[in-house]
Amino acid sequence: VLSASDKANVKAVFGKIGGQAEEFGAETLERMFATYPQTKTYFPHFDLGKGSAQVKGHGKKVAAALVEAANHVDDIAGALSKLSDLHAQKLRVDPVNFKLLGQCFLVVVASHNPALLTPEVHASLDKFLCAVGTVLTAKYR
């Protein structure tokens, strides 16, 4: 459960990275594919090379979902309901991959904004990303 302080920290992070969210989304995917190559199996039709238009396009979708969740931090489940349905019923992405993606996103945020990611903010952002992952896997059976 995100506290009021966690919610404020999450909103502050997304306020700070706002204009870079799409780039962060693509960089997060690139990092995930390089660090956890097994995640590539969900994208057999993608050019997964660095700077790929397809990775950038999907990174934009990832970023949009995270921004949407941050903008609706009091109702992440409602904000991501359709995306949860898609991942559970059609794409059937292994739930562990959401955790891996979240870890990579934390690294990207930290690498670009080291002063922003204090221990408290890091903990809040990690809790938020775990909440997003929980929502995205809630409809799995």
UniProtKB/Swiss-Prot annotation:
Keywords: Heme, Iron, Metal-binding, Oxygen transport, Transport. Red blood cells. This is Hemoglobin subunit alpha-A. Belongs to the globin family. It comes from Sturnus vulgaris (Starling). GO terms for molecular function: haptoglobin binding; heme binding; iron ion binding; organic acid binding; oxygen binding; oxygen carrier activity; peroxidase activity. O2 binds at H58. Involved in oxygen transport from the lung to the various peripheral tissues. GO terms for biological process: hydrogen peroxide catabolic process. It holds the Pfam family Globin. The keyword Transport applies. Heterotetramer of two alpha chains and two beta chains. Residues 1-141 form the Globin domain. Heme b binds at H87. Gene3D superfamilies: Globins (1.10.490.10). PANTHER family: HEMOGLOBIN FAMILY MEMBER, HEMOGLOBIN SUBUNIT ALPHA. GO terms for cellular component: blood microparticle; haptoglobin-hemoglobin complex; hemoglobin complex.
